[in-house]
UniProtKB/Swiss-Prot annotation:
Tissues with expression: Expressed in the submaxillary salivary gland.
Name of the protein: Submaxillary mucin
Chain spans, region Disordered: 1-89
Subcellular location: Secreted
Keywords: Glycoprotein, Secreted
Glycosylation sites: 3, 7, 14-15, 23, 25, 27, 29, 34, 38, 42, 47, 49-50, 54, 59-60, 67-68, 73, 76, 78, 83
A GO CC term assigned to this protein in UniProt: extracellular region
Lineage: Eukaryota, Metazoa, Chordata, Craniata, Vertebrata
Compositionally biased spans, kind Low complexity: 56-71
Post-translational modification comment from the UniProt entry: Heavily O-glycosylated at most but not all Ser and Thr residues.
Note on domains (UniProt): The mature protein contains tandemly repeated, identical sequences.
Length: 89
């Protein structure tokens, strides 16, 4: 039920859920990171929403593709924190 993410040359991770008001489609994520405890999410062209456990749960980008809402903090299941990433449908 969560969105599946992939890192560039790193381990994958699974987000716990999706933002309310989205299409319900999985979002693919790519991120760069350094050891830490969170992952930053930003919107990118074609994006629908940030992760379900983002800093502002319930925020949706539906109808506003390409709008950048700013960094979101998402708990890292892999112990890797990093720079903002794009979540795209």
């Amino acid at each position: 039920a969560g969105s599946v993410g992939r890192t560039a040359g790193g381990p994958g991770f699974t987000s716990p859920g999706r933002v309310a008001g989205g299409t319900g489609s999985p979002t693919a994520s790519a991120r760069g990171g350094t050891p830490g405890g969170s992952e930053g999410f930003t919107a990118a062209p074609g994006s629908e929403s940030t992760g379900g456990h983002s800093g502002a749960p319930g925020t949706t980008l539906a109808g506003r593709a390409g709008t950048t809402l700013g960094p979101r903090s998402e708990p890292s299941g892999t112990g890797v924190g990093g720079s903002p990433v794009a979540t795209t449908l």
